[in-house]
UniProtKB/Swiss-Prot annotation:
Induction: Expressed in the late phase of the viral replicative cycle. This is Uncharacterized protein K421R. It is found in: Virion. GO terms for cellular component: virion component. Keywords: Late protein, Virion. Belongs to the asfivirus K421R family. It comes from African swine fever virus (isolate Warthog/Namibia/Wart80/1980) (ASFV). It comes from the Viruses. Its main location: virion.
Length: 422
């Protein structure tokens, strides 16, 4: 009397057929976009990079350009000329932020987001280490962000409740990207470290500085000290304490310098830009313990990041023999281990220094963290606002603020080139 119907299977088959028909309809548009990216050596980012890396179909292309204003207009014109009487007749270029962010819609659908490469002082673009992936559509070798930068992007979103609807998809991306990332690097950990004798000699002084760093509730531990206390796994002169602060990084510098001066502790503090293209606001404060005036006798003991000054960071609390302090969730810890790896790769590329051993060390730390038994869901994704430390900045409000500062530019319609736009 009753017939079994595979409703889910039928729905999936119908959806797959619809998606394929839709992709066939816009195949020329997608191919033109990829050819443009290839010819102009643009760098794919965001979810587009994840899909490219995993050899899946892309429907919305996000990429960096070294001449974003000209490239956005040229690509919009190319797309319009594909079929100006029908499919691409309604091609429009929208300026979100002049010289920084553009969007191209075709047939009332968003296909392209172009971004300017973030710049440092003197408007020099942040260096992005070249990484290639073969496109599933055109079989061309396209530039994209490397796996370490893509994972940093993923972990940033997994720590941000604004992206909660994307978390299931992001977790799938994370698992696949992490597996591919770890396959590319040697897994052996070099068990030798320099300056062991000298560091042990000053261990009590260094520990005093470190305990002061973790004593305040404005700071979150994200690396180094966690491994030393939880996993009993430390290499001398490598396992520096990693922190996030919710204060201004220059305010932190004054606080730390004042504490060390009042206690007769000799340190050197430097603030630099880690040159992270996916996070240009990031700054790092580095503390070196120096018991003499000889730079060769300086020990790097703390890296502090200003992430909490412009975004919320999820935390957990941990108790040790030295006291209790806040630590970042596993995804926060993973994110900043990868930041260290990125910085070391950049140093190796720009200075030709051999950083292989220390990169292997941080990769080992990352792998150990991600292979550890997962904590509860509450420890991964805190639901209480009290577990988040930092300053929330509404991204939409930030965009509107940037738009108000700059002259508004009307949309550019390639079919009407005489109009003053873009």
């Amino acid at each position: 009397m009753y017939t079994h119907v595979d409703v889910v299977g039928i729905a999936e088959a119908s959806a797959a057929l619809y998606v394929q028909k839709d992709r066939d309809r816009y195949s020329d548009v997608l191919t033109t976009i990829e050819n443009f990216i290839y010819q102009h050596k643009c760098i794919i980012t965001g979810e587009s990079a994840h899909l490219l890396f995993l050899k899946k179909n892309i429907y919305l292309y996000e990429f960096y350009s070294n001449n974003v204003a000209e490239h956005s207009k040229a690509l919009a014109t190319l797309l319009y000329k594909l079929d100006p009487e029908y499919l691409t007749r309604y091609t429009v270029l929208i300026t979100k932020i002049p010289n920084h962010w553009y969007v191209i819609n075709v047939d009332q659908r968003e296909f392209v987001r172009l971004y300017a490469i973030p710049a440092v002082k003197q408007h020099l673009p942040i260096p992005i280490l070249p990484f290639y992936c073969t496109s599933a559509l055109t079989q061309q070798e396209l530039f994209c962000l490397g796996p370490e930068l893509q994972l940093i992007q993923i972990y940033s979103k997994l720590c941000n409740p604004n992206f909660v609807e994307e978390w299931p998809t992001l977790l799938d991306y994370e698992k696949s990207m992490r597996t591919l990332f770890l396959e590319q690097f040697p897994q052996r950990l070099e068990m030798t470290g320099g300056k062991k004798e000298e560091e042990e000699k000053h261990e009590s002084i260094i520990k005093k500085i470190i305990l002061e760093m973790v004593s305040t509730r404005q700071r979150i531990v994200v690396g180094g000290y966690i491994q030393k206390n939880l996993y009993n796994h430390v290499l001398k002169n490598r396992n520096r304490l990693q922190l996030i602060t919710s204060l201004n990084i220059y305010e932190e510098k004054d606080i730390i310098q004042q504490f060390c001066d009042s206690n007769g502790l000799k340190i050197k503090i430097r603030i630099n830009n880690p040159l992270l293209p996916t996070n240009p606001e990031l700054r790092r404060l580095t503390i070196y313990f120096n018991n003499t005036n000889d730079d060769d006798q300086s020990y790097l003991i703390v890296d502090m990041y200003n992430t909490g000054s412009y975004e919320l960071v999820p935390t957990n609390q941990i108790n040790t023999l030295d006291g209790s302090f806040l630590i970042g969730t596993p995804f926060v810890q993973a994110r900043f281990l990868l930041v260290e790896i990125w910085v070391l790769m950049l140093i190796a590329q720009q200075t030709k220094k051999d950083t292989k051993k220390i990169i292997q060390f941080f990769i080992n730390q990352y792998e150990m963290l991600m292979n550890s038994p997962w904590p509860s869901m509450e420890a991964l994704f805190p639901s209480s606002s009290k577990r988040y430390l930092g300053n929330y900045v509404d991204p939409n409000a930030l965009i509107k603020w940037a738009q108000l500062k700059l002259k508004r530019i009307p949309p550019f319609y390639p079919g009407k080139p005489d109009e003053k736009s873009c």
